[in-house]
Amino acid sequence: MDKGEDEQGAYHQDLIEQLKAPLKRCTNKCYCKCCCYHCQLCFLQKGLGVTYHAPRIRRKKIAPLDRFPEQKQSISTRGRDSQTTQKGQEKVETSARTAPSLGRKNLAQQSGRATGASD
């Protein structure tokens, strides 16, 4: 039984030495389960995503350019064709004045009866 205990003790010591040994560079770039767990370095880098190298340099974010600068003009005069839109508005206003809608008074005049009176 001493032989079995000695082998088991030697096995444990071997495992501890492997853990304390410096990590060797692994050139395997596969991320399958078998390759992620085949050595301690691959487990740390591929399995857990832990890397101990200098972080990559990140560019500073540049302030966004003013795409819509504040304009001192009113909203109605900002458009490209401000003159044509004003002409179009005048046409709409004149057409509304020339063709009044039929209301209660106009209906009464057309029918010849007073509105609201019943026979």
Curated annotation (Swiss-Prot):
Coiled-coil region list: none
Q: Where is the composition biased (Polar residues)?
A: 71-87, 107-119
- What subcellular compartments does it reside in? Host nucleus, Host nucleolus
Q: Which UniProt keywords apply?
A: Activator, Host nucleus, Host-virus interaction, RNA-binding, Transcription, Transcription regulation
Cysteine-rich: annotated segments: 26-42
What are the boundaries of the region Disordered? 61-119
Indicate yes or no for the key word Transmembrane.
no
Q: Which GO terms describe its cellular component?
A: host cell nucleolus
Coarse class of the primary localization is host cell
Any Pfam family from its record, for instance, is Tat
GO molecular function: any one?
A: RNA-binding transcription regulator activity
Q: Region (Core): which ranges?
A: 43-53
Per UniProt, the short sequence motif Nuclear localization signal, and RNA-binding (TAR) occupies residue numbers 54-60
Name the domain of life this protein comes from: Viruses
Q: Name one GO biological process term.
A: positive regulation of viral transcription
Subunit organization: Interacts with host CCNT1. Associates with the P-TEFb complex composed at least of Tat, P-TEFb (CDK9 and CCNT1), TAR RNA, RNA Pol II. Interacts with CCNT2; the resulting complex is unable to bind to TAR RNA.
Q: What does this protein do?
A: Transcriptional activator that increases RNA Pol II processivity, thereby increasing the level of full-length viral transcripts. Recognizes a hairpin structure at the 5'-LTR of the nascent viral mRNAs referred to as the transactivation responsive RNA element (TAR) and recruits the cyclin T1-CDK9 complex (P-TEFb complex) that will in turn hyperphosphorylate the RNA polymerase II to allow efficient elongation. The CDK9 component of P-TEFb and other Tat-activated kinases hyperphosphorylate the C-terminus of RNA Pol II that becomes stabilized and much more processive. Extracellular circulating Tat can be endocytosed by surrounding uninfected cells via the binding to several surface receptors. Endosomal low pH allows Tat to cross the endosome membrane to enter the cytosol and eventually further translocate into the nucleus, thereby inducing severe cell dysfunctions ranging from cell activation to cell death. Through.
So what family is this one in?
Answer: Belongs to the lentiviruses Tat family.
The protein, known as: Protein Tat
Provide the gene name from the record: tat
